[in-house]
Curated annotation (Swiss-Prot):
It catalyses: [glutamine synthetase]-O(4)-(5'-adenylyl)-L-tyrosine + phosphate = [glutamine synthetase]-L-tyrosine + ADP; [glutamine synthetase]-L-tyrosine + ATP = [glutamine synthetase]-O(4)-(5'-adenylyl)-L-tyrosine + diphosphate. It comes from Shewanella amazonensis (strain ATCC BAA-1098 / SB2B). Signal peptide: none annotated. The gene is glnE. Residues 1-450 are annotated as: Adenylyl removase. Its EC number is 2.7.7.89, 2.7.7.42. Belongs to the GlnE family. This is Bifunctional glutamine synthetase adenylyltransferase/adenylyl-removing enzyme.
Length: 961
């Protein structure tokens, strides 16, 4: 900020700084002693520009004099390491180390922010200063922990007796020495060789030593204390992400990237850099990573990978409703990085000079190699500098991680002042021009967008035509006999013309509609497809990014029309949750259904894009994953790609993957406040989730809720390990409450699942989570027959192996009790009659697939009776929780004749499939009785044979009429 510009500080900033200075003078007058008029004015202005600087100097006013004693003029980066090592030399406790690191970080960041706001540091210098500070904090923290742990546990050694260090890869902007002010730091921990510690009380495996050290280092840097934090640490870029070990050896790292490394990990590794003093281990680490990142040949496949990654980022921008985002939006910072990294990955194998972590260094090399023209280099550099300066200043205002332009006048004034712009309008214009240039170069590099002249297509005329005669003539010319189409389109167009969608939205809609109409008229009856398709468009009318998505992706338009025609339920989902439109872009990916065993790993991968500590985004991501996968299942269902028998399997395995993540998130949130139950060993939870009903029976439908029961295995009265200790039983209660909260909270993407806990012991009046032995006692001594029927369909879906084994024992024991067949028949039939009286509401001549006599419920009751009546003699009947395999087992044991079992299975599958189909058509689960008479009559007859006739049921003859 020049002297001239300092004189033009806006009034609001001046007043804010003046009030702060007056308060400081009143409380700490000694801190201003010795400052001249120019220095006081600069202090006042900077306090008005940055809440973070003002806050930090209010806490430590003694630092003001130090800053003016030469610290603002230049930064000696080598001093960071020296001063931190001196400060930590006499520290003996982790809490003290945390305080030292945080206070040093805050002081230096205030100093660097001051230099940014006053124009004392060019961008490159500022980013290098922040990166050097971050590296010094990480490495001195690492070295202090290493010394402390070696004293207590011994020193990790390789087979030849050489000490082994913890090596840290700095990823992203930290690796490139381009870290911005409030960025997370992405790290990967590794060590050279396996071995054991020497010199401690007992030897410890090197990997275990370094995992403990890594956990403590993450905590040392990221835990929030009274002094704040050093950096938010993200470890999810390590091999296998969150599910992988925190620290792996060099050889394991090399094996992973050679065998399983993915395209996005190649991009991440372009900027990877071993932190700390360079050593032979640093060389070794970079050498083993190089073949994965840089291929020996010119690798144009990197372009397609980049397109996919950019597509994912665009999806995130839409899903998170990000506007004015100068990092992720079109033409943002990330697109510059993509342009440069794509060239690095394509040619870095042949051109060693491109193997640099520095973006500016790579751009200069690309120019010298003739890969970028001077104009492109000049535009990309200048645009990037403006956006990075704006990003850095935005974050330095209040030490917050943001890339979004301000939403208030004061912060706009601060930004304009620091960037020497007259006003918000001028700065916006400069930023928009910069982003337009970046996006132009990005498109020139990666392409992938559709170019088509709509004006030459008849549908452009049809969309714009005003006269009915002209519209009808256009349809006749195309041999389209659908008189209802033009009135529908005309009415919709008139309605939309009154909607305030802005000039950009209007222009995009006018480009989209001819293309969408081209897809619509390919349907057998275009007017029949009009309402579901255009309802989706109407829902995204004010979300221009989604209109652009449909405009630029012919595959997405084709899938939108075909799926909306095939299923009103899918159309409804797309209208309610527009982010699902992203899934339509690539038809091959849409119909590439996740395999049953991969839902868990897919979900873990999906959650990598979301900050671990952002609970709201984590909850939203879970819902978006569910909606996305559900859409893929439904799309494959209605098009016949997925056999209808497998639909429930996929919906069930999807739910189980989500349950696992919800429990882990809930556990982390409760444990962060209270610690964990003290009786647990590492990796244990002592907690289990039991599925009942459709989830337990592996028969989940599209709209099914989850019947769950929670169990734990602690009988004592111990406490948790955290600072806010609570009783273990109370911990598990809080865990259950948090799980239910994560499921039921309604976010932008709705509720995750509706969870029904009424099947727990004592129902709605019982505890939310039961101790497992108490659960067993309840089932043996207090549960009603209908609760044992429910237990037939129960299944362990999450938890410790010990709990899984004990639950299986309890379930088998309860189901295997000796029961009086006559009494059991009476109780089962009474419950079925009661259910029918409450739930069966059907018009004459119609058949309710679930509740009508001969329907799904009758089949389920037959299965439950067979298990309860026969398990005392035939233990195999307790193995399965799903109806189909219960009937198969009953046939194998000669409890049911094979033809009868086959008839029940056929009827059950048919009725369930019809129910799926009706759900996708958004219709009630009812059909004309005649349509299912063959199956229902057989079921009624078998029900009567197994359980006996009900006196209040009509005879079979009248039911079949």
């Amino acid at each position: 900020m020049s002297q001239q510009h300092q004189a033009e500080i806006p009034k609001e900033i001046k007043e804010k700084g003046s009030l702060w200075l007056a308060s400081l003078e009143a409380h700490h007058p000694e801190s201003l002693t010795g400052l001249d008029t120019v220095q006081r004015r600069e202090l006042e202005q900077v306090a008005g520009l940055s809440d973070f600087i003002a806050r930090e100097l209010s806490r430590h006013p003694e630092r003001i004099a130090r800053l003016f004693d030469g610290l603002l003029d230049k930064v000696d980066r080598s001093a960071f390491d020296r001063e931190l090592h001196q400060a930590l030399a006499s520290v003996t406790s982790e809490d003290e180390a945390k305080a030292v690191l945080r206070r040093y970080r805050n002081f230096q960041m205030a100093r660097l922010a001051w230099r940014d706001f006053t124009g004392k540091a060019p961008l490159g210098e500022s980013l290098l200063d922040i990166s050097s500070l971050a590296e010094a904090l990480i490495i001195t923290g690492r070295d202090w922990l290493y010394r402390e742990m070696c004293q207590s546990l011994g020193t990790p050694m390789d087979a030849d007796g050489r000490p082994q260090p913890l090596m840290i890869l700095g990823m992203g902007k930290l690796g490139g020495r381009e870290l911005n002010f409030s960025s997370d730091i992405d790290l990967i921990f590794t060590f050279p060789e396996h071995g054991e510690t020497q010199g401690g009380r007992k030897s410890l495996d090197n990997q275990q030593f370094f995992i403990r050290m890594g956990q403590r280092l993450v905590n040392l840097l990221s835990q929030v204390t009274v002094d704040g934090f050093v950096f938010r640490v993200d470890m999810r870029l390590r091999p296998y992400g969150e599910s992988g070990p925190l620290v792996v050896s060099f050889s394991a790292l090399e094996d992973y990237y050679q065998e399983q490394g993915r395209d996005w990990e190649r991009y991440a590794m372009v900027k990877a850099r071993a932190l700390g003093p360079w050593s032979g281990y640093s060389d070794e680490l970079h050498s083993l990573l190089r073949p994965f990142v840089y291929r020996r040949y010119i690798d144009f496949s990197a372009i397609e990978s980049l397109r996919r990654m950019k597509q994912l980022i665009a999806q995130e921008v839409r899903r998170r409703h990000l506007t004015d985002n100068i990092k992720l939006g079109a033409g943002g910072i990330r697109e510059v990085e993509f342009v440069v990294q794509s060239f690095q990955l394509i040619r870095g194998g042949r051109e060693p000079s491109l193997r640099t972590q520095s973006l500016f260094g790579a751009i200069d090399t690309l120019y010298s190699l003739g890969q970028l023209e001077y104009l492109a280099v000049d535009e990309l550099k200048n645009a990037y500098v403006l956006l990075r300066r704006a990003e850095n200043l935005l974050q330095a205002i209040d030490d917050k991680q943001t890339q979004t332009l301000p939403d208030n006048s004061l912060d706009w004034q601060r930004l304009c002042c620091a960037l020497e712009m007259a006003n918000e309008f001028d700065l916006r214009a400069h930023i928009e021009a910069a982003m337009a240039k970046i996006h132009r170069h990005f498109r020139a590099t990666v392409g992938g967008e559709e170019a088509e002249d709509n004006h030459e297509h008849w549908t452009w005329q049809f969309w714009n035509v005003q006269e009915e005669d002209h519209a009808e003539a256009l349809l006749q010319d195309q041999h389209i006999d659908d008189p209802a189409l033009w009135p529908l389109l005309k009415g919709w167009r008139e309605t939309m013309s009154r909607r305030p969608i802005g000039p950009r939205g209007r222009e995009t809609l006018d480009r989209l509609m001819p293309k969408l109409l081209g897809e619509l008229v390919s349907m057998p009856i275009p007017s029949a497809a009009f309402a579901p398709v255009f309802n989706v468009v109407e829902q995204v009318l004010t979300r221009t990014t989604y209109l652009e998505l449909l405009c630029e992706n012919p595959g997405a338009r084709a899938q939108l029309v075909s799926l909306c025609c095939a299923s009103p339920w899918i159309a409804d989902q797309l209208a309610k949750f527009p982010m699902l439109l992203d899934e339509l872009i690539d038809p091959a990916a849409l119909y590439d259904i996740t395999s049953l065993d991969d839902y868990g790993s897919e979900l873990r991968q999906y959650l990598l894009r979301v900050p671990e500590d952002d609970m709201e985004q984590q909850m939203e991501a879970l819902r978006q994953f569910k909606l996305t996968q559900q859409l893929k299942i439904a799309a494959a269902d209605v098009t016949g790609v997925l056999p209808i028998m497998q639909v429930s399997d996929h919906l069930t395995f999807l739910a189980e993957a989500i349950i696992e993540q919800v429990v882990h998130q809930a556990w982390g949130q409760v444990a962060s406040r209270h610690g964990v139950p003290a009786h647990l060993e590492s990796g244990q939870m002592g907690f289990a989730v039991i599925a009942y009903g459709k989830l337990g029976g592996i028969e989940l439908g599209y709209g099914s809720d989850l019947d769950l029961v929670f169990l734990h295995n602690y009988q004592g009265s111990g406490l948790t390990t955290g600072e806010r200790q609570i009783e273990t039983s109370h911990f598990y209660l809080k865990l259950a409450q948090r799980i239910l909260h994560l499921f039921s909270t309604r976010t932008t993407s709705g509720e995750l699942y509706e969870v029904d806990m009424r099947l727990r012991p004592s129902g709605a009046s019982g505890l939310l989570v039961s101790e497992i032995e108490r659960f067993g006692e309840y089932q043996q001594q207090e549960a009603w027959t209908w609760e044992h029927q429910a237990l037939v369909r129960s299944r362990f879906v999450f938890g410790d192996n010990q709990l899984a084994a004990r639950f299986s024992e309890i379930r088998a024991e309860v189901l295997g009790k000796v029961r009086d067949p006559a009494v059991l028949k009476g109780e089962v039939k009474a419950m079925r009659t009661k259910m029918r009286e409450h739930l069966l509401k059907v018009d004459e001549g119609m058949f309710d697939l679930k509740q009508s006599p001969g329907g799904i419920a009758d089949i389920e009751f037959i299965a439950q009776y067979l298990v309860l009546a026969g398990s005392a003699e035939f233990e195999d009947l307790t193995v399965w929780s799903d109806n189909v395999r219960i009937f198969q087992t009953a046939a194998e044991l000669d409890i049911l004749p094979l033809p009868v079992a086959q008839q029940l299975i056929a009827a059950y599958c048919t009725l369930r499939d019809e129910n799926h189909r009706l759900t996708l058509q958004r219709e009630a689960g009812q059909l004309p009785a005649i349509a299912v008479a063959e199956h229902s009559e057989r079921v009624c007859a078998i029900y009567a044979d197994v359980l006996g006739h009900d006196t209040d049921e009509p005879p079979l003859e009248s039911r079949s009429q």
